[in-house]
Swiss-Prot record:
Family: Belongs to the MfnB family.
Catalytic activity: 2 D-glyceraldehyde 3-phosphate = 4-(hydroxymethyl)-2-furancarboxaldehyde phosphate + phosphate + 2 H2O
Swiss-Prot/TrEMBL keywords: Lyase, Schiff base
Enzyme Commission code(s) on record: 4.2.3.153
InterPro entries the UniProt entry points to: 4HFCP_synth (IPR007565), RibuloseP-bd_barrel (IPR011060)
Reported function: Catalyzes the formation of 4-(hydroxymethyl)-2-furancarboxaldehyde phosphate (4-HFC-P) from two molecules of glyceraldehyde-3-P (GA-3-P).
Name of the protein this chain belongs to: Putative (5-formylfuran-3-yl)methyl phosphate synthase
Recorded GO MF terms: lyase activity
Residues at the catalytic site: K29 (schiff-base intermediate with substrate), K87 (proton acceptor)
Amino acid sequence: MLLLISPDGVEEALACATAAEHLDIVDVKKPDEGSLGANFPWVIREIRAAVPADKPVSATVGDVPYKPGTVAQAALGAAVSGATYIKVGLYGCATPDQAIDVMRGVVRAVKDFRADAFVVASGYADAHRIGCVNPLALPDIARRAGADAAMLDTAIKDGTRLFDHVPPEGCAEFVRLAHEAGLLAALAGSVKAADLATLTRIGTDIVGVRGAVCEGGDRDAGRIQPRLVAAFRAEMDRHARAFAAAPAAS
């Protein structure tokens, strides 16, 4: 399982660089603009320069409306600015067909520029609260659009969490559908260390966190701390070892 950490600017990216051995992907977002709020192009460039070259940089394009052309341009901007993972929050897409329209534009724009770019179609575990596409539709949307991964996050950051809206068995189905479609499955949404056993068991490929590695567990007021990144990774590795050993022990 890969660990994706989301700094909100260059200062926190430098903290991630200090803890680079413990993480896999540095994800650029702007939390005050939403769950998948997009940051400025120059911030993406500065963060790309700040973190080790062997660590991929991801960038969110935003909690986007159903405006395929607008979103495709934004996605290309993120790629030009140095991101290799491009995440799109399908916030304003009420139907799978709308979501596919948006994602096809993103895939073409980004991969025409950089063939090895990695495109992530992101939905929301709490989709029922905002009227967007069903979370379990995301793997098929991503597959039909030519994306590389399907992701779930939470749209409304009010203390509720991924498993509050899509229980573990639902997340397991999401992962299964993603894998059947040949995609990676990414899960986020106020994920905590206590969730890692379940996330490991269901076969999650990428776990995305912010609050769990911030002071006080606060994604907004807290700052990312290298020691908390290291501690979270240690828990990931512990659960991975335990899961790998379980069949042999049984």
